[in-house]
């Protein structure tokens, strides 16, 4: 089938649903940041069900293989010290893509900036530029037929960079956590590898020609900008296109 994700921080954590021995229902298990140390499935034949990041090497099923992007490549925008003075919009690159049909937007335009379409949590990709200067997904295990339409800068946050309201309880240290899990340590080099990310708009075909289309708009605050005519039109394009395409 087809799938649309109009949010950020989508599919960052794997969870497990456990049946109670009494038959009284199920519970959700999520060890999250401590999973690689404390989840009892680690070291067993079931360790791929560890309730940590989907992209953790122990799990080995990064969300970008389905969504086209993931929060390891940019988790926050305009939140704490993550791109605090960014425009709040996506910069358009592939202006001929069906996502942007009827918007009138052209290469270099801002989508949704006036109402802050890009903000809080995000989904991004490892970006590069092709021979035409257009963005492409660079991760080796990217979803097939990934087309990056627009993006905005985003970042993981380090200790001390969260808003005071969050830091008052405990800094999550996402920058250090992601660096350690993906690159094995929190050296300056590893931290830089997960510091400079993005919020992305893209489409992909995770199952190739035999499967459906996934449309990802990687920003939690997208919904707050629906009064922007271009944002509304993009949302309509997603719904109409994915409902019209035959299911595979």
Language model region names:
Residues 1-114:
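A glycine-rich, often tryptophan-bearing local segment used as a flexible ligand/cofactor-contacting loop or short
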Residues 12-32, 37, 91-94, 98-248:
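Extracellular ligand-binding/catalytic regions of CAZymes and related secreted enzymes
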């Amino acid at each position: 089938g087809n799938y649309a994700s109009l949010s950020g921080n989508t599919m960052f954590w794997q969870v497990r649903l456990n049946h109670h021995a009494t038959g009284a229902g199920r519970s959700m298990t999520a060890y999250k940041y401590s999973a690689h140390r404390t989840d009892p499935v680690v070291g067993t034949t079931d360790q791929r069900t560890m309730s940590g990041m989907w992209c953790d090497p122990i799990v080995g099923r990064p969300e970008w293989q389905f969504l086209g992007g993931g929060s390891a490549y940019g988790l926050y925008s305009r939140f704490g010290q993550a791109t605090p003075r960014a425009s709040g919009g996506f910069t358009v690159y592939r202006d001929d893509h069906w996502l942007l049909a009827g918007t009138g937007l052209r290469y270099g335009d801002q989508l949704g900036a006036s109402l802050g379409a890009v903000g809080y949590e995000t989904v991004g990709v490892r970006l590069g530029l092709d021979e035409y200067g257009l963005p492409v997904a660079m991760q080796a295990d990217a979803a097939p037929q990934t087309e990056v339409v627009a993006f905005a800068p985003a970042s993981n946050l380090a200790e001390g960079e969260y808003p005071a309201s969050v830091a008052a309880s405990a800094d999550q240290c996402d920058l250090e956590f992601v660096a350690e899990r993906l690159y094995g340590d929190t050296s300056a080099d590893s931290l830089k590898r997960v510091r400079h990310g993005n919020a992305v708009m893209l489409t992909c075909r995770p199952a190739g020609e035999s499967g459906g289309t996934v449309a990802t708009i990687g920003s939690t605050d997208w919904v707050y900008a629906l009064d922007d005519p271009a944002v509304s039109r993009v949302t309509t394009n997603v719904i109409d296109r994915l409902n019209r395409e035959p299911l595979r």
